[in-house]
């Protein structure tokens, strides 16, 4: 543990670790060989200074090396966010994932139970009847038969148990809040990736590029949502074959009305499951609008739509045809088989 103490002294001094040093430090953290006091001091020092891109790359590499992997079809994507926007919005990315899968794109959704909201992806899917915590072979079957799977973070990142008590004791978010969304167990290389802090957007996009992602839209709503919002514009950093570009999405430009944050607010898992089901049954609402907007982005990132407007139209069609409702029904059936 002398090496970890050296890394701890480095970050405590305000200096940054190299990519290799960060990988070694997080290997130690995730192995359970670091004391709680050392772990807390290390995570606090990183948070106070702000994590460098090399430190994040090293940390993600350590996470990915320990995760339980899932085999996914070529071209599978994820729609995921860092969380932590404290908006209380309903499960936008979960519904967007269902709509995207209903349009023929494999979605390997990675998520967890609620951290700062009342209902995380895992919570609402359980309320809808989906069995979570499945082994990799069952998840591969979900992808094959339903076009969609849900990879429960606690199942795939067991090493996180070593730092969970320390994270619970710290009254602020740490680097681990961004590591989960960057560590998809299916190894997808295309993502719609929401961030709750605008300062994270470009660095984390570059991190994904360094780690092999091919096509990414990193999004942050003007209202703070870690989604493409319908209350106003959303800033997007797009990664395409190693190059980054910046643009803004206005929902009105793809035929969707503006909403308020109150319109998008959710509740507990049962409330959100009922709202999601209503959208799949054809209900017109702000919930539907933001879901088709984010699904449209997923289709563009997957290469299944040439423009956002085309993607939104396809997502609308998946609801109206009943394909999205059928996709969820298949996921429920296959996950419980």
From Swiss-Prot:
One of its GO terms (biological process) is L-tryptophan biosynthetic process. SUPFAM superfamilies: Nucleoside phosphorylase/phosphoribosyltransferase catalytic domain, Nucleoside phosphorylase/phosphoribosyltransferase N-terminal domain. Belongs to the anthranilate phosphoribosyltransferase family. GO terms for molecular function: anthranilate phosphoribosyltransferase activity; magnesium ion binding. HAMAP family: TrpD. Binds 2 magnesium ions per monomer. The lineage of its organism: Bacteria, Pseudomonadati, Pseudomonadota, Alphaproteobacteria, Hyphomicrobiales. Catalyzes the transfer of the phosphoribosyl group of 5-phosphorylribose-1-pyrophosphate (PRPP) to anthranilate to yield N-(5'-phosphoribosyl)-anthranilate (PRA). Anthranilate 2 binds at residue 167. It comes from Methylorubrum populi (strain ATCC BAA-705 / NCIMB 13946 / BJ001). Keywords: Amino-acid biosynthesis, Aromatic amino acid biosynthesis, Glycosyltransferase, Magnesium, Metal-binding, Transferase, Tryptophan biosynthesis. This is Anthranilate phosphoribosyltransferase. Its cofactor is Mg(2+). It catalyses: N-(5-phospho-beta-D-ribosyl)anthranilate + diphosphate = 5-phospho-alpha-D-ribose 1-diphosphate + anthranilate. One of its GO terms (cellular component) is cytosol.
